[in-house]
Amino acid sequence: MADEEKLPPGWEKRMSRSSGRVYYFNHITNASQWERPSGNSSGSGKNGQGEPTRVRCSHLLVKHSQSRRPSSWRQEKITRTKEEALELINGYIQKIKSGEEDFESLASQFSDCSSAKARGDLGAFSRGQMQKPFEDASFALRTGEMSGPVFTDSGIHIILRTE
């Protein structure tokens, strides 16, 4: 029976005090609905092709001297080359893949984005809100999947899709 199946991530079953009916609430997106959520959806919606209209991602950004704003909360003036930034990114990817480090701790320690304070979490976003290469990579990832190096005007990113 469908009611016995596990709910998608973020969803919980609640009882309406006013109507006495069961409804479903997503504590990540704050969405609520009467119908049981299906599949891997976290309330982010799907377009007509079954693609999500919103995703949630975390990232680790390494800026370099050619970044559009070569400074960060970690360093006032970033002087590393693009090649050095890519070496750092590839090193972080290896540490994550080997299990030596987890994504969130590396993002909080080494990301040049202020989202480091949130362990790299950028929250949910729709198409058109991020730089195109970042957006394309984010929407191409499956939930729980990590990207390789993604190049934008901001620098080089590792992206982890969380929803």
Curated annotation (Swiss-Prot):
WW domain segment(s): 5-39
Cystine bridges: none
Residues carrying Phosphoserine: S71, S108
One of the record's GO cellular component terms: nuclear speck
GO molecular function: cis-trans isomerase activity; peptidyl-prolyl cis-trans isomerase activity
Biological process annotations from GO: negative regulation of amyloid-beta formation; protein peptidyl-prolyl isomerization; regulation of cell population proliferation; regulation of protein stability; response to hypoxia
Record PTM text: Phosphorylation at Ser-71 by DAPK1 results in inhibition of its catalytic activity, nuclear localization, and its ability to induce centrosome amplification, chromosome instability and cell transformation. Ser-71 is dephosphorylated upon IL33-stimulation of dendritic cells.
Official protein name in the record: Peptidyl-prolyl cis-trans isomerase NIMA-interacting 1
Organism: Bos taurus (Bovine)
